[in-house]
Amino acid sequence: MRVTTSFPLGTLRDTPSEAEIISHQLLLKAGYIRRVYSGIYAYMPIMLKVIEKISKIIEIELNSIGCTKLLLPQLHPANLWKKSERWEGYTAGEGIMFNLKDRQGKEFGLAPTHEEVITSIASEIINSYKQLPQCFYQIQTKFRDEIRPRFGLMRSREFIMKDGYSFHSSEKDLASFYEKVGNAYENIFKSCGLETVGVEADSGAIGGASSKEFMVTADAGEDSILFTQSGSYAANIEKAVSIPSQPIPLKNNISGWIETPEQKTILEVCKNNNLDPSQIIKVVVFLAKFEIKSEVPILACIRGDQHINEVKLFNLINKLHSSNLLHLQKIEDIKIIEKNLVNFPLGFIGPDLDNETIKASSNWDKTWTRIIDHSASTLSKFISGANKVNFHKVFQEFSFTSKDYLIEDIRNAKKGDKIKINDNEELKEKKGIEIGHIFQLGQKYSEKLNAKFSDKDGHLKNLWMGCYGIGVTRIAQAAIEQNHDQKGICWPIQISPFEVIIIPTNLKDQIQRDLTEQIYNNFLVNKIDVLLDDREDRAGVKFKDAELIGIPFQIIIGRDSINNEVELICRTNNTKFKISAHKLLETFISESEIMYNKNS
């Protein structure tokens, strides 16, 4: 393709102010995307080529394991989501689904995911075990009503995703296929030139028995990955479990009440009273809002040197109640005032807080749901709030079980913790960008949407189901996070918009012009994905743009063209070959094969 006639570059000289991370900056500056509105982007021709190459890699790999491509509607009737009991969770409060009504007043949602639609279709077309297993996938635009879109294509309102759904006759068959898809994902990401790590993950709103995320390690990642150096364990922070460090025992001479004026935080209490955070139990108040029932107040207790994992807490509370949990909110002073709770000792609460403290609350259950983390429940002597403003006290041999506490894992695992499968290994931490997620859904959706099949004995059974997502546009941006330098993008050759760019330095020179056309046409004939920068701009402008857009190889046609010589440059390592034009194609093919093989 030629820049002047079919492939305008649209590069920028200045870095857009709204771009926070390097990959977002480079996508905008190099002209790959254009911002239309917050979280909404146009994919320019050069970006579309990247997306198409990523999509092709995905299709080849998924087709090889027996998956079939289709295309599902983006507009979903609300009744399907109400059958699965996800409508309220996805549209109310902080729900992420854009929703609307048609002129007849019927409700619809713009799809962030397609479990309901595909399960409904499966219930109509699959009726026998002889038709199983089946796996369908699509690559198309998804929508999320993000509260705060940021980081370009990482967290946008509209994005391109591959989502797949498999149906099985047994849990065993589902588990086997789940592993097969996991292996295919590893091949896909490797073929895209990415370094990834697979981690145990929380299933979130999609649900299911187990799930695994695939992360690109990058400093700009929003997710924290905890892992061992040996590779024996890896999980995201929402899911990770570990053995915490041992607490420092409280001295025998410390007892009774401790005056702690205006000392509401663990840090303040420790600093003013010569204590260690591991000697304190902090009590955090949450309010759980459900789809159908009054709000439930939660007392969550954890050791002072640990942090509550709100995802684990959310999942636990959701399991305890029959109604769907919509959201979990930490209670601050303002909420206490709104609920007419006078003299509520927020900041000085202890684990023995009485139910009487919430009797006057409106719309709340009148009994605390009490939960304590394992690490805190084993403390025989500790300090906590005295349920009186400006006071803490020492607790000794406090019985959490007699106070109806559930003892559960609600803490964040962290760097330096030992792992449960081998207490000789410590957790390390790094940041990651999620680009893929696979789930074993079990029968969650088939039960609710009545998707059944007849087994070999003629009995009707619910289908077993898995789902598998890849963020296509996320892969593109994550690849830039892992592959850039101070000059611009350094694309892995497999997903680069072009393999090579030809840059004539002076098109007014007839020798250069003729040699440029000869090389360009020769590369086209040999099916090389080539871009010709045939602009009349200065050579320096062309060089700068070529480095910015990041095409793996550059062919410079300059003054040496009079001797039929050109320069071949590798973008990633700046290796340069000054060679005769008739050896150029052979040299390029050899060097590009090395690059392809490096990432295969």
From Swiss-Prot:
Task: Return the similarity comment.
Answer: Belongs to the class-II aminoacyl-tRNA synthetase family. ProS type 1 subfamily.
Subunit: Homodimer.
Write the gene name: proS
> Record's Gene Ontology CC terms?
cytosol
Query: Briefly, what is this protein's role?
Result: Catalyzes the attachment of proline to tRNA(Pro) in a two-step reaction: proline is first activated by ATP to form Pro-AMP and then transferred to the acceptor end of tRNA(Pro). As ProRS can inadvertently accommodate and process non-cognate amino acids such as alanine and cysteine, to avoid such errors it has two additional distinct editing activities against alanine. One activity is designated as 'pretransfer' editing and involves the tRNA(Pro)-independent hydrolysis of activated Ala-AMP.
What the entry says about domains is: Consists of three domains: the N-terminal catalytic domain, the editing domain and the C-terminal anticodon-binding domain.
A family per Pfam: tRNA-synt_2b
Protein name according to UniProt: Proline--tRNA ligase
Q: What EC number(s) would the UniProt record show?
A: 6.1.1.15
Q: Which UniProt keywords apply?
A: Aminoacyl-tRNA synthetase, ATP-binding, Cytoplasm, Ligase, Nucleotide-binding, Protein biosynthesis
Assign the protein's first listed, main location to one coarse class: cytoplasm
Under the heading SUPFAM superfamilies, the entry gives:
Class II aaRS ABD-related (SSF52954), Class II aaRS and biotin synthetases (SSF55681), YbaK/ProRS associated domain (SSF55826)
Organism encoding this protein: Prochlorococcus marinus (strain MIT 9312)
MF term (GO), any: ATP binding
GO biological process terms, alphabetically, are: prolyl-tRNA aminoacylation
Catalysed reaction(s) here are: tRNA(Pro) + L-proline + ATP = L-prolyl-tRNA(Pro) + AMP + diphosphate
Intracellular or extracellular location(s): Cytoplasm
Q: Which NCBIfam families match?
A: PRK09194.1, proS_fam_II
| Annotated InterPro entries | aa-tRNA-synt_IIb, aa-tRNA-synth_II, aa-tRNA-synth_II/BPL/LPL, Anticodon-bd, Anticodon-bd_dom_sf, Pro-tRNA-ligase_IIa, Pro-tRNA-synth_IIa_bac-type, Pro-tRNA-Synthase_IIa_type1
